[in-house]
Design a protein with these regions (language model features):
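TRNA-recognition modules of translation machinery and tRNA-sensing kinases, especially anticodon-binding
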Residues: 1-231
Length: 231
């Protein structure tokens, strides 16, 4: 769903994050999603899941809507930070002891994706003071920007422990009793920032753009996008 109720919003994020990000539908108990993670996690609200069904791994490509309160400066303009965009998101519900394995696996997917496009990337683990609310561990994936001559964030992978499952009442039924599941999320690709990374790292002096080999089959075999010449 592209809209979720307030009980789901309060279960997946803090009030401060909600106030800065979410668009509320006036006169309705509904909010536009800032990420499909919220819809995917919210569908399990109040459920008792058989432990044998864990892990539950999901992915979604959806529109996202964000107010982006507080964003300012030249590097925050244009495609970098917009109010509506599309994003590929991954979510996992698992046993607490399996969270590190899934964290490393999902983080690897994002790094592998960008490197398949010949884009230089690095990972930057967030210190405790930089962690967003509810997160236990988080790592940003950053791509190189030739224009800015620095790396910029293109993805993020996080473990949220039982913060979301406790608020939403998502439990697993195991041999030794019921317990709260651990949730994780991973942004594989937000299309605006992905487009910036592809364009900047493949831009040529004559104004043309090289198409990464991995994308050429989806571009009819085309290798170069050339600028239109003035008539």
């Amino acid at each position: 769903p592209f809209m979720i109720r307030s009980d789901v919003v309060n279960g997946v994020m803090s009030f401060a994050e909600m106030d800065a990000m979410m668009y509320k539908i006036e006169g309705e108990d509904l909010y536009l999603i800032g990420t499909s993670e919220h819809s995917m996690i919210g569908k399990f609200k109040g459920q008792l899941i058989d432990e044998k069904k864990l892990p539950i791994a999901m992915t979604s490509y959806s529109p996202c809507f964000r107010k982006e309160v507080g964003a300012h400066g030249i590097e925050e303009r244009g495609l970098y930070r917009v109010h509506q965009f599309e994003k590929q998101e991954m979510v996992v519900l698992c046993k607490p002891e399996d969270s590190e394995e899934w964290y490393n696996k999902m983080l690897g997917y994002t790094v592998e994706f960008f490197r398949s496009l010949d884009i230089p990337v690095r990972t930057l683990e967030c210190c405790s003071g930089d962690l967003a609310d509810l997160k236990v561990k988080s790592c940003d994936v950053e791509a190189w920007s030739p224009r800015q001559k620095k790396y910029f964030e293109v993805g993020s992978c996080s473990i949220l422990g039982d913060a979301q499952s406790r608020r939403l009442g998502i439990r697993a039924k195991g041999k030794e009793g019921n317990y709260l599941v651990t949730t994780l999320n991973n942004t594989v690709l937000a299309t605006p920032r992905g487009m910036i990374a592809v364009l900047e790292n493949n831009y040529q002096a004559d104004g043309s753009v090289k198409i990464p080999k991995a994308l050429q089959p989806y571009m009819g075999g085309k290798e170069i996008i050339s600028p239109k010449k003035d008539k």
